[in-house]
């Protein structure tokens, strides 16, 4: 069952939001707001868990493979945590830059620790840890 709610936004904020949802292909504001709420709930569940529950996350990394031993450092972290690495994708973006996408699974605190360790490795140009969920509690 859907329940109708009302919100108040400044004109400029609403204009920016409407542009954003149009660019992303949302049919209406409601679906975009539902996605924002779901994302916030997944983030909260991931960070507020006791750390013992099994969690799944995706880590995205961009780095220069010519950077001094960086690829080896990243591989070492993955090998140290090999049970948590479900899948890894490596893409050569250009002659120097690589994209790695890792799917991690394990105890929440272990997944977060590994993901943060990879993202914080010196030489990583861009890194992000994104929690995932099966959506059982999202309605």
UniProtKB/Swiss-Prot annotation:
InterPro entries to which the protein is assigned, alphabetical: Acetolactate_synth/TF_NikR_C, ACT-like_dom_sf, Arc_rbn_hlx_hlx, CopG, CopG/NikR_regulator, Ni_resp_reg_NikR, Ribbon_hlx_hlx, TF_NikR_Ni-bd_C
Tell me the residue numbers annotated for binding Ni(2+): 79, 90, 92, 98
Q: Which HAMAP family match?
A: NikR
- The name this protein carries in UniProt is Putative nickel-responsive regulator
- Keyword Protein transport in record: no
Task: Read off the lineage from the record.
Answer: Bacteria, Pseudomonadati, Myxococcota, Myxococcia, Myxococcales
Its domain of life reads Bacteria
Function text: Transcriptional regulator.
Q: Mention one GO molecular function.
A: DNA binding
Species name for this entry?
Anaeromyxobacter sp. (strain K)
Textual note on the cofactor: Binds 1 nickel ion per subunit.
PANTHER family in alphabetical order: NICKEL-RESPONSIVE REGULATOR
Per the similarity annotation, which family is this? Belongs to the transcriptional regulatory CopG/NikR family.
Q: Gene3D superfamilies given for it?
A: ACT-like. Chain A, domain 2, Met repressor-like
List keywords of the entry alphabetically.
DNA-binding, Metal-binding, Nickel, Transcription, Transcription regulation
User: Which cofactors are reported in the record for this sequence?
Assistant: Ni(2+)
User: What is one process in the GO biological process aspect for this record?
Assistant: response to nickel cation
